[in-house]
Structure formats: C-alpha cells, structure tokens
Amino acid sequence: MRSHVWAHGCDHAYLAEPGPGSVPPPPVEADAPAWASAQRAVHAGTQIVEVTLHGTGTGSVVLEDLEVRVAARRTPPAWNVYQMSQGCGGALTPAAFTVNLDAPRPVLRPVAGNDSGGETGRVIPAPAFPMRVSAAEPVVLRVEAATTGCDCDWSLDLRWTAPSGTGTLRIDDNGRPLRTSAATGRPAYGFATEQGRWAR
C-alpha cells in the first residue's frame, strides 16, 4: 500500500506545524513518507492511496466492494501548507475512486481516467466492482480522498470472496488510520530553488 502518491508524480501538499525556516527542501515522491514523518506533516486537502492486490494460491479472488470508514473528524490544525511542486502536469490521469471525506456518509465514486499522450486521447474506463484477481493478475486500486472541512482519520474496508471463504481487508497506515486535513486559508509556501528557501 502506498499512501504518499502524488498527482502526476510531482504535485502534492502537506500541512506541518514548523515554520518555513525549519523545514527542509521538498523531497522526491519516493522519499515523501520519511520527509513527512520527520516534519510530523499530514496530507493537506487531498490524499491519494494506491493498493496492489493479488491472489496467493492457484485460485482467483473476487473483490466485492470497497467502503470508506471515517473514524474521527477534528478541527483542522492551524499549521502551514508546504507545496511539493510549483506546478506540474502529466499526460496520464489514472482511473480512480474519489471520495469526499466531509460527507456525512462518504461514498466512493468511480471516475474514468484519460491518456492524452498520443495524437488522440484514450479514455481509461472507471473502475468497477466486482473485480477478479489472482497471483498472476493483480489489480491496483487508486483512491483519491479530499476534505475542505476536517482533520480526518479514515480507512478503507475491502470485502472479498475466495474458494476458501469470505473476508474483509482493512486498508490503513500500518495499523493506524490514514489522516488527511483541510488546509483552507492556511499560509502556503512553495520552495524557491534559486534562493534555497520556502517562500509565500
């Protein structure tokens, strides 16, 4: 499970308490978990989670449904926003499930993606349950969560069926809830490479 996925591999924001003079330069995406942990930072506004699922035996597993569980909603902390990019884009927008964490009963909504890298854009079909996976045919689930009103603790519950029985897989941050916080109105900083510092 990857919980620090950036849009287009370069666009993301974190909310952190330290002032800009105490925060190191932005990392590359692969180093984001360690960077965020060192700053005690949380995802600002949005969080993208990717989970790779596959079977373990000779048979296939049917993924039946995926549900969002919001465990807590708090007032967003009055911290600073640190932008990991000064603007970037990409030709590929993956298909995903999106969810509004502010909704009273958050529901995942499938959204189609697109690949505009060629002469003609190609639509990537929206994901849909049920899905069948096996050891040889994995599936990557992408969830894009957003909030404008809370400091949210949340997780995902995946229901599955296999020849051996049924079950529910909890998807979280190594036993802890995932955490995404609204950042509306907070001071936002981008990294000024020429000056080697964060600036508004």
Show which residues each predicted segment covers.
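Extracytoplasmic low-complexity, Pro/Thr/Ser/Ala/Gly-rich segments
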Residues: 1-43
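Short, solvent-exposed beta-strand/turn "edge" segments of beta-rich domains on protein surfaces
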Residues: 34-44, 52-61, 76, 132
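Extracytoplasmic
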Residues: 46-48, 94
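Extracytosolic low-complexity repeat regions of secreted or lipid-anchored proteins
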Residues: 48-55, 64-73, 155, 159-160
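Short, hydrophobic/aromatic beta-strand segments
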Residues: 59-67, 77-80, 109-112, 155
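Long, charge-dense
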Residues: 72-115
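Acidic, serine/threonine- and proline-rich intrinsically disordered appendage/tail regions
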Residues: 97-121, 126, 153-157, 161-200
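Low-complexity, intrinsically disordered segments enriched in Ser/Thr together with acidic residues
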Residues: 117-151
